[in-house]
């Protein structure tokens, strides 16, 4: 599943632009072990099970599902037939059911003339989302039984389970469809089932529908028959063995376009009829990517078809249901005339992510949600591996390390968690869908590939997939597969891989020791956080020290953590990558000669940050100001990031970090510029929350002066590579938002002409965001933009307008946006988390956003689910730029009052830590920034 993280942009679905858009706009509930008595029937029969996890002695083998949804009454009924076996005698069958009305349950045994069917007594435990079926006599070990359950339910008004979605045609007609979103624990909302990933089974699915509708599911349609009342019953082929959360079905009036891969797999994209002309790009990308994965994994895609469906109402970014992946429209549909370059990048990466899941996650699935990263970390990592080959023009490899910085931002907090961490209840499970599971997971895999070599790493994961196909795995299963490729005894592994002699190194450490992958990677998956590596150069001796990097403390936290850190470095004397495996707290390596500078973590391929003691930072700052291209753009971006992260823990002064940033005046590459903005913009956002207007204004002016030359070079066109176009879009937006008059005047001219054409003038896509942001500042412009928003068929255009509308300084209009997006009539509720956060970043809007969150909390967690990434996004988006003690006390007071309805959410702990960090940071650095802004070096800019 692609979740939409805190730093998101629905306008682009791009991991790159997300953080900048947000910046420019201006543990868990305690119900996993219930203390209340188990529920009882009216006759006093108690519920026979008191754990969240299901017992393991009843095993599902095959499901036969019949579901009929009425899109007029918004209800559905169904029959679930589950073939089961028992591994021990039992008269109790425990499975999941949530918000379903069970009308009858029976147990079938035997076959032919000896077939018998007995009624089962049904007990419900709503709090645990379980039902118990009590048989009149114990089930016998090894014999086949079939449980038959008749039930009914209402189509969900949320974004999970079997839920209602709507859209309007060009003519304004409202149409209704029904779709599913089961991951992680919502299959139980559509049919009673053993809703845990380890209970894999096959599925036969039948859907009843009206003739005017179309039904699709995981497998191809086998036949359709007419049944009572003129309804059509679609029978779909039997699935492969899979987890319940991967089941999917959609009843709609969608249309589709299709192509066939080289291996004969039919790939189709489904969308509402008015938008099917936007499906071609995703279709071509899906075909290419599916073919790539079949070749890379050396395992054929096991299903005969792969559908991709754009759902009008969708909470996350996308979902990997086997054979029927589902997406937000903005994550799948590409309008050649109006979609941005970053939208193309985002769509490509999202499709790559979901198709990677067809192997990582679907074919091989984590045993339990504590190892979710085995699914999501791999899928995130494979996005970059695949797209770098299938779409080289996108140059996605340059952007990978940005995901590591995103992960580090939350992993630096005490409230972070290990990549693999225990979870039990649904809210805890939902909280696992975060930057640590996705981005840190991907980053440590990339680090491992860099350490082992690409070929050895590939061989290891192919063996992992082949060995565990249609099964479930734990952390150690992956390391065991890697270990078989790379033995720990120092002997060359399979096919000669893992021989360290293939790497040049100034150190014997890398050569002589065996590659103990499991021991090494356990330090990265079983410990939270990441190391700070401190480098001290004494002549030819390089002293290295590792400690746990954690914000909120000027000293290293006393966690006792040690990592096996595969260090890489280059020097002023050699651009060859040198390698050193640091397994102890301190170590020393000896260079062949003295050097002027040394740069560790080459290309940001390692998940750690580096501090250079003594004059180390001065040397690197001088290098950047003199010949910044002496190191790669990724290395330049990582230096910017590391410098400002060190300010947070008191290892480097804010003046030195700001001095380093001055080199950006000569920078032209996207990643260093974006990283510079990611570090500098939050500084004045913190000032906004303290009403420090004078210094805030000076800082914004400094930022524009710093990048003015690059801004002035931007053309108001759609020319150039994807990275050049994304850089243009963000620089022009930055300039216009900060009232840089050459930009504002040009944007005003474009907006005036666009408005005079009634929105028919074709604007350059790359400048549209800046044009709309300027146009929305007037009441007339805002109203015109909203009128166009209502009827636009382009996801990119709608999101660009949405962004602009949230930029207004009119509080009444901001409040209206909050109210209407929450209602969902005029603006879809799926947009609400983004709108709330955009308004939370608006200097005049953030009090409105914070008040709205508090006032509507109970409704929000009902709609978006406690523990979901959407709830985390809203909590962090409305509060994590607060920088005063008054706001901190407000935040603490509100969330503590929620008790089990949110007080222990990880995002709440994160935002409290972040606000405390903001307060401390401002107290220590604000006066220094004020003085620095008046320094002579700035006068010479």
UniProtKB/Swiss-Prot annotation:
Location(s), subcellular: Endoplasmic reticulum membrane
Membrane protein topology class: Single-pass type II membrane protein
Keywords tagged on the record: Adaptive immunity, Aminopeptidase, Disulfide bond, Endoplasmic reticulum, Glycoprotein, Hydrolase, Immunity, Membrane, Metal-binding, Metalloprotease, Protease, Signal-anchor, Transmembrane, Transmembrane helix, Zinc
Post-translational modification: N-glycosylated.
Any one cellular-component term (Gene Ontology): endoplasmic reticulum
Assembly notes: Monomer. May also exist as a heterodimer; with ERAP2. Interacts with RBMX.
Protein name per the record: Endoplasmic reticulum aminopeptidase 1
Organism per entry: Homo sapiens
């Amino acid at each position: 599943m692609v979740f939409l993280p805190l730093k998101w942009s629905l306008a682009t679905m791009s991991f790159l632009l997300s953080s900048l858009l947000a910046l420019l706009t201006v543990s868990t509930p305690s119900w996993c072990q219930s203390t209340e008595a188990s529920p009882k029937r009216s006759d006093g029969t108690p519920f026979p099970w008191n754990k969240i996890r299901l017992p393991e002695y009843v095993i599902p083998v095959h499901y036969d599902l019949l579901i009929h949804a009425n899109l007029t009454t918004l209800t559905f009924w169904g029959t679930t037939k589950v073939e089961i076996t028992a591994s021990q005698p039992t008269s109790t069958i425990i499975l999941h059911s949530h918000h379903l009305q069970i009308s009858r349950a029976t147990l079938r045994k035997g076959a032919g003339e000896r077939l018998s069917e007995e009624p089962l007594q049904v007990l419900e435990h709503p709090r645990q989302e379980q039902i118990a079926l009590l048989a009149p006599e114990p089930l016998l070990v090894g014999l086949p039984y079939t449980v038959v359950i008749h039930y009914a339910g209402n189509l969900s008004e949320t974004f999970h389970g079997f839920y209602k979605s709507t859209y309007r045609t060009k003519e304004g007609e409202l149409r209704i469809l029904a779709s599913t979103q089961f991951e992680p624990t919502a299959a139980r909302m559509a049919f009673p089932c053993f809703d845990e990933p380890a209970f894999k089974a096959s599925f036969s699915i039948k859907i009843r529908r009206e003739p005017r509708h179309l039904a699709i599911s995981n497998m191809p349609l086998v036949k359709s028959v007419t049944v009572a009342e003129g309804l059509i019953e679609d029978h779909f082929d039997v699935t492969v063995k899979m987890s319940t959360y991967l089941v999917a079905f959609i009843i709609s009036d969608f249309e589709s376009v299709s192509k066939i891969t080289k291996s004969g797999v039919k790939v189709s994209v489904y969308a509402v009829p008015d938008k099917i002309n936007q499906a071609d790009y995703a279709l071509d990308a899906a075909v290419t990517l599916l073919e790539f994965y079949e070749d890379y994994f050396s395992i054929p895609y096991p299903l005969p078809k792969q559908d991709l469906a754009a759902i009008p109402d969708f909470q996350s970014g996308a979902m990997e249901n086997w054979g029927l992946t589902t997406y937000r429209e903005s994550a799948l549909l590409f309008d050649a005339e109006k979609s941005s370059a970053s939208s193309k990048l985002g769509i490509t990466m999202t499709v790559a992510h979901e198709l990677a899941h067809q192997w990582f996650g679907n074919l091989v699935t984590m045993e339990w949600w504590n190892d979710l990263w085995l699914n999501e970390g791999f899928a995130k990592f494979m996005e970059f591996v695949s797209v770098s080959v299938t779409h080289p023009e996108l140059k996605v490899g340059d952007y990978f390390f940005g995901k590591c910085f995103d992960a580090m931002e939350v992993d630096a907090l005490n409230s972070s968690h290990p990549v693999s961490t225990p979870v039990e209840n649904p809210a805890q499970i939902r909280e696992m869908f975060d930057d640590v599971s996705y981005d840190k997971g991907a980053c440590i895999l990339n680090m491992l590939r860099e350490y082992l070599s690409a070929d050895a790493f590939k061989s290891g994961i192919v063996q992992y997939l082949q060995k565990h196909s249609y099964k479930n795995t734990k952390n150690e299963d992956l390391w065991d597969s890697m270990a078989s490729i790379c033995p720990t005894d120092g002997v060359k592994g399979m096919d000669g891989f893992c021989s360290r002699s293939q790497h040049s190194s100034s150190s014997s450490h890398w050569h002589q020791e065996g590659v103990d992958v499991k021991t090494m990677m356990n330090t990265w998956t079983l410990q939270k956080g990441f190391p700070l590596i401190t480098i001290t150069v004494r002549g030819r001796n390089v002293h290295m020290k590792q400690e746990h990097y954690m914000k909120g403390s000027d000293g290293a936290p006393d966690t006792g953590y040690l990592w096996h850190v595969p260090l890489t470095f280059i020097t002023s004397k050699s651009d060859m990558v040198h390698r050193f495996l640091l397994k102890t707290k301190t170590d020393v390596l000896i260079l062949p000669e003295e050097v002027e500078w040394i740069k560790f973590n080459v290309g940001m391929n390692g998940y750690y940050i580096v501090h250079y003691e003594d004059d180390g930072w001065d040397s690197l700052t001088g290098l950047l100001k003199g010949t910044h291209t002496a190191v790669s753009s990724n290395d330049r971006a990582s230096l910017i990031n590391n410098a400002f992260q060190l300010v947070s823990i008191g290892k480097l002064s804010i003046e030195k970090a700001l001095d380093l940033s001055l080199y950006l005046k000569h920078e032209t590459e996207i990643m260093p510029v974006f990283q510079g903005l990611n570090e500098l913009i939050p500084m004045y956002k913190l000032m906004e929350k303290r009403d420090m207007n004078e210094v805030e204004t000076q800082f914004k002016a400094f930022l524009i002066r710093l990048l003015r030359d690059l801004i002035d070079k931007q053309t108001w066109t759609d020319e150039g590579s994807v990275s050049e176009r994304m850089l243009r879009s963000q620089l022009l937006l930055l300039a216009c938002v900060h009232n840089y008059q050459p930009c504002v005047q040009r944007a005003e001219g474009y907006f005036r002409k666009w408005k005079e054409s009634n929105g028919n003038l074709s604007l350059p896509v790359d400048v549209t965001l800046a044009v709309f942001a300027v146009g929305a500042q007037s009441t007339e412009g805002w109203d015109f933009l909203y009128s166009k928003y209502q009827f636009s068929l382009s996801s990119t255009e709608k999101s660009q307008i949405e962004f602009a509308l949230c930029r207004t300084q009119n509080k009444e209009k901001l409040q209206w946006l909050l109210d209407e997006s929450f209602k969902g009539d005029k603006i879809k509720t799926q947009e609400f988390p983004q709108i709330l956060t955009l308004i939370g970043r608006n200097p005049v809007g953030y009090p409105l956003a914070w008040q709205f969150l508090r006032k509507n909390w109970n409704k929000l967690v009902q709609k978006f689910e406690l523990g979901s990434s959407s709830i985390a996004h809203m909590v962090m988006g409305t509060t994590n730029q607060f920088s005063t003690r008054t706001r901190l006390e407000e935040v603490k007071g509100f969330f503590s009052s929620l008790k089990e309805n949110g007080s222990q959410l990880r995002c709440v702990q994160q935002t409290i830590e972040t606000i405390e960090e903001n307060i401390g940071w401002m107290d220590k650095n604000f006066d220094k920034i004020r003085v620095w802004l008046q320094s002579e070096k700035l006068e010479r800019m």
